[in-house]
Amino acid sequence: MFEVALCIMTYTVVLILEFLPTVLYSLEKSEWRRFREFVDNLPPALAPDKAKLATRIDNVRAASGRIRPLLDKVLIFFIVLGITLPTMHQSALGSLLLIAPSKLNPLWHTGFLPLLFLINCIYIGYSIVILESILAAYAFKRPIEIKELSGLARIIPWLTAIWLSVVLGDLAWRHQLGAAVRFDFYSCFFLLDVGLVAVGAGMLFRKGIRWSPRWLFVSAVLILLGGGLYRFNVYLIGFNPGPGWTYFPSLAEVMISVAFVAFEILAYQLLVKLVPVFPRISLHGHGESGKVDSEQESAA
């Protein structure tokens, strides 16, 4: 758990540093119009001296202009670090239950748990990028970046094929395939998570589906539900802490998680509106993407 906490904390710092050039660019190029309007509306007793304020804004602009090129030079290091760190804490999340063979149902307990959690996080990551990109395109009325998303979608089915091969091959090696089709409580949850991932990823083998925003969205949702359920199965459904011990998240815990998600959505909306997160459509060849999207969707 210490390793997981340390990796997540470090990873969060790395993500902030990766995003910092965008913030610095905004500080350097912005006219600070909203901030100036806010200051102008302050009561005279609270309003700062305008000349000093203008000087401080110029200082912030100049500092941002000096720091950003320096950060750009070392950004590749943080990008590599940002890719490496998740492989550590994601596999560690699987390793946590290696010491509990008597408490985790045999359908999920395996020596391959670190590998399965690592592959699981990768295909979930690609799927959430597809889901978020499509939702953002509709929410902010931007063209869907179908070319880039279809490229990601080509990778997902092969990753899930490896994951499913390890899952099913391990069950066969441990003589647990019969337990997987017993259709009891644990078997149903196992089949549900495997089925959702298999169906969602299997759809992406078809080129027409990969070029259809609607079907890309459906497949991403199925994979996310199946991949997320796999983790619930390992840590909640299939885990038995022992006689007299039970655990399920309380309403307060669930609401805290919901609040975190709501805060992340709010922060996302603020950031994409305040800093240049989205690329300019005219500079990235998406002027005709709406037409391409509709044509490909009809073909699918």
Name these PLM-found stretches.
Residues M1-I209, S282-E288:
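Long, contiguous internal "core" modules enriched in hydrophobic/ aromatic residues
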